[in-house]
Amino acid sequence: MSQTQDYECRSHNVDLPESRIPGSNTRLEWVEIIEPRTRERMYANLVTGECVWDPPAGVRIKRTSENQWWELFDPNTSRFYYYNASTQRTVWHRPQGCDIIPLAKLQTLKQNTESPRASAESSPGRGSSVSREGSTSSSLEPEPDTEKAQELPARAGRPAAFGTVKEDSGSSSPPGVFLEKDYEIYRDYSADGQLLHYRTSSLRWNSGAKERMLIKVADREPSFLAAQGNGYAPDGPPGVRSRRPSGSQHSPSLQTFAPEADGTIFFPERRPSPFLKRAELPGSSSPLLAQPRKPSGDSQPSSPRYGYEPPLYEEPPVEYQAPIYDEPPMDVQFEAGGGYQAGSPQRSPGRKPRPFLQPNKQGPPSPCQQLVLTKQKCPERFLSLEYSPAGKEYVRQLVYVEQAGSSPKLRAGPRHKYAPNPGGGSYSLQPSPCLLRDQRLGVKSGDYSTMEGPELRHSQPPTPLPQAQEDAMSWSSQQDTLSSTGYSPGTRKRKSRKPSLCQATSATPTEGPGDLLVEQPLAEEQPPCGTSLAPVKRAEGEAEGARGAAEPFLAQARLAWEAQQAHFHMKQRSSWDSQQDGSGYESDGALPLPMPGPVVRAFSEDEALAQQENRHWRRGTFEKLGFPQILLEKSVSVQTNLASPEPYLHPSQSEDLAACAQFESSRQSRSGVPSSSCVFPTFTLRKPSSETDIENWASKHFNKHTQGLFRRKVSIANMLAWSSESIKKPMIVTSDRHVKKEACELFKLIQMYMGDRRAKADPLHVALEVATKGWSVQGLRDELYIQLCRQTTENFRLESLARGWELMAICLAFFPPTPKFHSYLEGYIYRHMDPVNDTKGVAISTYAKYCYHKLQKAALTGAKKGLKKPNVEEIRHAKNAVFSPSMFGSALQEVMGMQRERYPERQLPWVQTRLSEEVLALNGDQTEGIFRVPGDIDEVNALKLQVDQWKVPTGLEDPHVPASLLKLWYRELEEPLIPHEFYEQCIAHYDSPEAAVAVVHALPRINRMVLCYLIRFLQVFVQPANVAVTKMDVSNLAMVMAPNCLRCQSDDPRVIFENTRKEMSFLRVLIQHLDTSFMEGVL
């Protein structure tokens, strides 16, 4: 599956009118649109109606600007309205003198092809004419077997100005409808007008972090929670199954009701949801019909993409606040060996709520009926749960359940846990006290291996299973769906239990994103286990009513689980290395951590299809998905590299060569393609996989920032966007008081350099202070780089944006980030290397390429050496080096190109000949330990600065300084002096003078000339008279110079050790036998 196929929304075969830029005759086919809150870019073709996430190649794209307005259409008033994504203004009248992007054409396209079934499914509380608050539209992609209208991708989290709730079509404010979903979309609205959910049919939600749904935790649940995992239409014959063409593009966990052969369509019977049902007020049979909607003025902007913003709705009272779960809230287990699942809610055609557990009037109550959730005696415990910093920040604002304080059903009851029962199908209800665990600790007893909300499953001791059956039958073990061990950030590495055969097969009538594929063979779905479907149905009928009592807990746990599942699932999809059929995804497919409050990710069919595409992934996959610490901190063995996407497995400087080799060998065996990711034995960079690398890292390491009188929490998205305000505490959590103080001052200095704050000192001195702070205090480095990433994100002041990238380039010239943040900074820089990101007057791609190069180099060399702090000259040189490349670290051809204007007649690099002459001029051939004793590092740095300006100071006294700089120049060449393609020949002929000389003459001309000049230079030092003084014979010289001419590409320490000896021998043979007389007088 190609990336374009996966990310674009295909349109119906309807021609759209041609669009042109106002005031221009240029035909406008592709335009860039930026969602106002999440700042996600998408590209729409106004001719074909195609929408893609990645910029199309080879076409002109109209960049977004403050002068861009979106033309939308309100079907209720039959009027066009206009929305400015930059200023977030919505007006009725057509703006003048600006670019109008006619997005309403896509609306018209949808309306012309909309299925009549959408109206058939409408019911009270689902008014199709009611606009959505927060504009919660998401991108939809039609299934391959259907012909649906194309929709413009949009995100959740629109500002209130972009969408407000309307009661009647005569509203005086512009509508909130951006683009409605096409082809059978069912919307639920709560009594106060909030969108509850969408139910979609024969459609896929588009992948990645670019689609969201706002789901009010109130009354009903989306169809992806109500889908029947066994593939049978409820109340229908068991032989009737919903059909879809098989293939990797179909979701293995979401049931789609596609048209049958006779044209009929099955819809699931809809029952009240135990997860998304709001506690009802006394005497109110339906919260949908009980209360009027809130006026539009009460609407608030929805939460941004990665946010920890406060919820859109008021937080419930403390005494009724449901706990934040990191495990399922209860497990109702029953006897009789049935495979009962409490988590398969459905909807009846009339959508009338049914009680979850109605008393059995004709028989004794079932064990499920005895479930009573009593009021928690220690409600304050729920608020004092100990979490790791990552887990607390992640879970704290994850889900809020709207509760009515007077509801008799609203009980804060004890939590229940699974109780393994070795007696086969016997179940029992075991309440347990509040489990106050630190998320950083592994779960011992009561560990929930499958985060399935209230679903009831066997908890028998695990039995051996074929891995394929494990993957197919377990919620958490299904290859890419979710490992509940990562349900909360602090507990991702806890060990999950493997389900037994009976346990897995009894879970077939489940619902939600972890369900089994409906197309799977029955033999795979239901291997012999001793249970039958009949007990399941009976138990289902007996236990329907515990849902009402446990609603608040179940809703919170279920929504948290859904969000976490989507997060882990999309993190797997973000792997840019192609899997099996080459359907890997590139850098815009990952999903960030869950949103706060009632904002919940929609688990889409498109997201679920990756489960089927990557069957070979195992249960342990998501236990290691959190950070690149897998290798950077050596927290686990490199043998687990298959359990994590490639970009999270960067070999670090502290990693041994054997681990790197093992990692690379397994990677090659997986992809079948050799990789150069471990060319250097210490560290190398790999293409980043996720747009949300920094956001994911930030969600676990950022401080909580608040704003305003009511101390509203600042979302991660806003914390990573440009700000003209100062910060009151560091962005990254730290316990170092000095770092806390310096971080706030550092942010002000960055603003001063970028021109966002008035400064008394000149910019160079401000940059010097910034670089000095980062160079001196290692704890400030990540803070500095995350602040620079923030100030260069969504910065529309071009001069400020250029200065921000310039300051990042300056800092990278002196010190790298810490290994923990290294890969995330790499991902941020990499995404800006495409020239499409360049704006008028700001060559962002040039800055990004330079920064990427410096970051790669800094990973190998570390921070600036020496005791002297950076000075103004070094700052000026680092600033100019962005557009005036240095002679150090460049290729030989580039060095020759730099000197072409100054020294057009030279055949050799000026820096090589000038430094060599300086060594001899300072009697280096009569200095003991020449080329072995290093020069003073501060003097070497100063000389390097001068040489890069085509100057050599006359006051040098120590020959070790130019000798050390000369070795540095050879060593830092972009490609080694003897290219890689000749390396094996050199190693093979290390003891043959004739063959070694032949290799030299086979080199490219510039390489041959430079190498011969070096050999002739070294031959001066091997003269017996000089060796007697320098103590550097031919073997010693070969030893110190060979690493500067040859580079071993192997990661095996044994190969490196053996080749080092051969490299020295090869260079010694050249010094002794290569005739360099033809280099006499050549410069």
From Swiss-Prot:
<keyword id="KW-0007">Acetylation</keyword>
<dbReference type="GO" id="GO:0099173">
    <property type="term" value="P:postsynapse organization"/>
</dbReference>
<feature type="modified residue" description="Phosphoserine">
    <location>
        <position position="726"/>
    </location>
</feature>
<dbReference type="GO" id="GO:0007165">
    <property type="term" value="P:signal transduction"/>
</dbReference>
<feature type="region of interest" description="Disordered">
    <location>
        <begin position="405"/>
        <end position="545"/>
    </location>
</feature>
<feature type="domain" description="WW 1">
    <location>
        <begin position="25"/>
        <end position="58"/>
    </location>
</feature>
<feature type="compositionally biased region" description="Polar residues">
    <location>
        <begin position="474"/>
        <end position="488"/>
    </location>
</feature>
<feature type="modified residue" description="Phosphoserine">
    <location>
        <position position="715"/>
    </location>
</feature>
<dbReference type="GO" id="GO:0005829">
    <property type="term" value="C:cytosol"/>
</dbReference>
<feature type="modified residue" description="Phosphoserine">
    <location>
        <position position="407"/>
    </location>
</feature>
<dbReference type="GO" id="GO:0005856">
    <property type="term" value="C:cytoskeleton"/>
</dbReference>
<dbReference type="InterPro" id="IPR008936">
    <property type="entry name" value="Rho_GTPase_activation_prot"/>
</dbReference>
<feature type="modified residue" description="Phosphoserine">
    <location>
        <position position="169"/>
    </location>
</feature>
<protein>
    <recommendedName>
        <fullName>Rho GTPase-activating protein 39</fullName>
    </recommendedName>
</protein>
<dbReference type="InterPro" id="IPR000198">
    <property type="entry name" value="RhoGAP_dom"/>
</dbReference>
<feature type="modified residue" description="N-acetylserine">
    <location>
        <position position="2"/>
    </location>
</feature>
<feature type="compositionally biased region" description="Basic and acidic residues">
    <location>
        <begin position="268"/>
        <end position="280"/>
    </location>
</feature>
<feature type="modified residue" description="Phosphoserine">
    <location>
        <position position="384"/>
    </location>
</feature>
<keyword id="KW-0539">Nucleus</keyword>
<feature type="modified residue" description="Phosphoserine">
    <location>
        <position position="690"/>
    </location>
</feature>
<dbReference type="InterPro" id="IPR038185">
    <property type="entry name" value="MyTH4_dom_sf"/>
</dbReference>
<feature type="domain" description="WW 2">
    <location>
        <begin position="63"/>
        <end position="97"/>
    </location>
</feature>
<feature type="modified residue" description="Phosphoserine">
    <location>
        <position position="406"/>
    </location>
</feature>
<feature type="compositionally biased region" description="Polar residues">
    <location>
        <begin position="573"/>
        <end position="582"/>
    </location>
</feature>
<dbReference type="InterPro" id="IPR001202">
    <property type="entry name" value="WW_dom"/>
</dbReference>
<feature type="region of interest" description="Disordered">
    <location>
        <begin position="110"/>
        <end position="154"/>
    </location>
</feature>
<keyword id="KW-0677">Repeat</keyword>
<dbReference type="Pfam" id="PF00784">
    <property type="entry name" value="MyTH4"/>
</dbReference>
<feature type="domain" description="Rho-GAP">
    <location>
        <begin position="890"/>
        <end position="1078"/>
    </location>
</feature>
<dbReference type="Pfam" id="PF00620">
    <property type="entry name" value="RhoGAP"/>
</dbReference>
<feature type="region of interest" description="Disordered">
    <location>
        <begin position="570"/>
        <end position="599"/>
    </location>
</feature>
<feature type="modified residue" description="Phosphoserine">
    <location>
        <position position="604"/>
    </location>
</feature>
<dbReference type="GO" id="GO:0051056">
    <property type="term" value="P:regulation of small GTPase mediated signal transduction"/>
</dbReference>
<keyword id="KW-0343">GTPase activation</keyword>
<feature type="site" description="Arginine finger; crucial for GTP hydrolysis by stabilizing the transition state">
    <location>
        <position position="932"/>
    </location>
</feature>
<dbReference type="GO" id="GO:0005737">
    <property type="term" value="C:cytoplasm"/>
</dbReference>
<keyword id="KW-0597">Phosphoprotein</keyword>
<dbReference type="InterPro" id="IPR000857">
    <property type="entry name" value="MyTH4_dom"/>
</dbReference>
<feature type="compositionally biased region" description="Polar residues">
    <location>
        <begin position="245"/>
        <end position="256"/>
    </location>
</feature>
<feature type="modified residue" description="Phosphoserine">
    <location>
        <position position="388"/>
    </location>
</feature>
<feature type="compositionally biased region" description="Low complexity">
    <location>
        <begin position="117"/>
        <end position="141"/>
    </location>
</feature>
<dbReference type="GO" id="GO:0005634">
    <property type="term" value="C:nucleus"/>
</dbReference>
